[in-house]
Amino acid sequence: MTNLSRRNALKNLGAIMALPLFMQTKLFSSENAKKGFKLITDGEVITGAHWGMLKLTIKNGKIIKSEPYEKILKIKNPFLELTGDLVYAKDRIKYPYVRKSYLQNPDDPKPELRGRDKWVRVSYEDAINLIAKELKKTRKKYGAEGVFAGSYGWKSSGNVQNSRILLHRFMNMTGGFVGVLGDYSTGASQFIMPHVMGTLEVYEQQTSWPVVLENSKVVVIWGANPIVTLRISWTVNDDLGLKYFEDLKKSGKKIIFIDPVKNETCQFLDAEWIAPNPNTDVAMMLGMMYELYNSKKYDKEFLENYCVGFDKFLPYLLGKNDETPKTPEWAEKISGVSAKTIKELAHTIFDNRTMIMSGWGMQRAHHGEQPHWALATLCAMTGQIGLPGGGFGLSYHYSGGGVPTAKGGVVGGITTGSTNSGGAEWLEVASKYSFPLARISDALLNPGKTIDHNGQKITYPKKIDFIYWVGGNPIVHHQDTNKFLKAWRLPRTIVVNEIYWTPTARLADIVMPATTSYERDDISMVGDYSNIAIVPMKQAVKPIGESRNDFEIFRDLAEKFGVKDKFDEGKSELEWIESFYDGAYKQVLSMNLIELNGVDMKPFKEFWQENKPVKFLSTMESESYIRHGDFREDPILNPLGTPSGLIEIYSETIEKMHYDDCKAHPMWFEPIEWLGMKNKPAEFHLVSSHPTDRLHSQLNNTSLREHLAIANREPVWINEDDAKAKGIKNGDLVRVFNARGQILAGAFVTKNIKKGVLKLSEGAWYDPLNSSEENTLCKNGSANVLTIDIPTSKLANGNIAHTALANIEKYSGEAPDLTIFKHPDPKA
């Protein structure tokens, strides 16, 4: 399978690092002093985060100002101003804590009391000893199969302090663990698209923005909100993705926006808005395909020379095998978009060079394998795949997809000590046993169960006794919170490294205080796809309380297992940073970029002392890059990674799986819950989009929440006609509920959402009214309390967060106080 993602090059070059044990407070008086570096107590420090390069102003050893390193955008990114909030948050975990019942008897820890028990502060040494003792106990009784450390989440940026990979490295060196397959973002598409296009597509470089701006006549944005999602990147944001959307706005091109919500991007671009019912994108695409075929506006030559299986798909499209032609009129009844609009859209994308930029929300739905497969088929019919400015792209909304890649050095990163996956870093399968990430609840609730997955059988562990989670917040980001809570209370031991008292930390047994990325040194590339710079992530302030770097925690644990030297390889943290930088420096020297391109890259000591990023330039080749252009030029010499080497509209591989919920070609499946179903369990379709004021659940405890909250809760968008019918006014406190749970939210009444649809952004911290009560009210408005926890299909087993119906009503009771942002230890 081919994978061109620039992120892979970044993440798969390095090795791990370590630092002297129990020396956090002495870091800058020892290691840095020996190198001649001092902590800046008054002045400016350059660093980076998911939301971009930062310039921090330090006074008397404290952060007093946070701002962008460079101001290149008209669009403001408020995340860049929140560093002080993050470091000095009231809910910082400053010390190690152990849940009282667990500390009293780890063999009978009363897991049902998680979230209600008292916390006991312990010493760091005692916490390390307790974790090591209980992990050894689990390993002795259950082996690697008893330890779950999949631990998915948006951990901090940085190539040294990668908490998840540090955890995996430690676990691999001490006996193995149970991990996960896939992720929450693209759980369906990352498994279906290799069958269709031969590669992940979702984490691949896109046709470059300069090519799009020069050649595309029409840009269709389908189910995405890049003005919001491009505020962040997996590494350090380069801001250039947003800059290109500013350029798109000024270009005068026809822009069409397809989404049930007229979101920030649609409004910013002043685009034509088409609003289908949620989860009906495939029906709409099929209607467009029927119109193209019926009007003979399709590229027969492209389908014959670059694709396989259109002839097997066609009978379904024409209704010859189910007596249901997929006409625009048929699609109208399902999608709510008029047949006239569907026909016009089909002709528009065929008659004009069109780039369809798709988001990922449509595949986080029941049968989520189908939308991007159908989209690839639609674009194959237009014959524009591989042409300048034509076809489709699945990553323009993410981490700067389409920003030309720079030519320069690439710093290495931490490894798990296992065989590399050759894919995106967080998709690396480092564990001995793995199951699909979205099936965590199912695996805990049904030990030993065997499931289908992408043509294979996977059996869940017979007993998960020990969970270790870092860099994530699963209580918030997993679907059907109440079901997840039942599963979460089954293991004997749960350990969490965390910066704040998140819902996940509150539901653990042992909590280790972790530093923010502003309290430690690190290094990172800038731009997931562009690799436009190397930024020194210099420590800005001393750690708060007894918080420790994640690598320190795992190095200390490794010492308890006798593998410290193997874990750290005898290097300190700064030495690992230096070695990664030196690797990139050698690459630059070998390409003679200092002389040829004027790259200002110096030996490490000067780089670190100078306190500024090293910048690289994009190339003419990257600026003219066309996704699948080589394949288009010669499909024989440049085949795709599919069995046929061609675009597989019909997959014989999938056909042999004999799945009833994912067949051999794209098709419309009725979701388990949607607006068109009979006997609806609730009235409205709930979409849980990316939040404007957070990175998933990160930043929910900052001042930004206070500015954007409504009725001091997560906002829920409701159409003005629906609100009037329900007696709801803008700013009202409302209850959103279904059979799975109930939440409080603040009503945002607007015309910018389709009737019958509610929008409640994911990521609000779960705040139960009564944690001892089943299906209790979430006071803060966590969307996953309402979502469904079943797989997309047997093929991908992705999550279906966007498939859910819910009711809404004005809340008549007294508004309860939020407690989730308060420290659980009154003595702290």
Spans of features found by a protein language model:
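N-terminal export/assembly segments and adjacent metallocofactor-ligating motifs
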Residues: T2-K297, S338, P768-A828
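N-terminal leader/propeptide and maturation segments of large enzyme subunits in energy/redox metabolism
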Residues: L103-D126, K297-V337, A540-I636, G641, ...
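Extended redox/cofactor-interaction regions of prokaryotic respiratory oxidoreductases
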Residues: N162-D247, S251-K253, F257-I258, V282-L286, ...
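Acidic/polar loop patches that form or flank catalytic/metal-binding clefts of enzymes
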Residues: G179-V180, Y298-E301, I342-K343, M355-I356, ...
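Long, contiguous, secondary-structure-rich segments that constitute the structural scaffold
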Residues: I544, N549-K602, S697, T702-W717, ...
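Short beta-alpha connecting loops at secondary-structure transitions
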Residues: D270-A275, I532-P543
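Flexible glycine/proline-rich, aromatic-decorated loop/lid segments
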Residues: E264, P503-P536
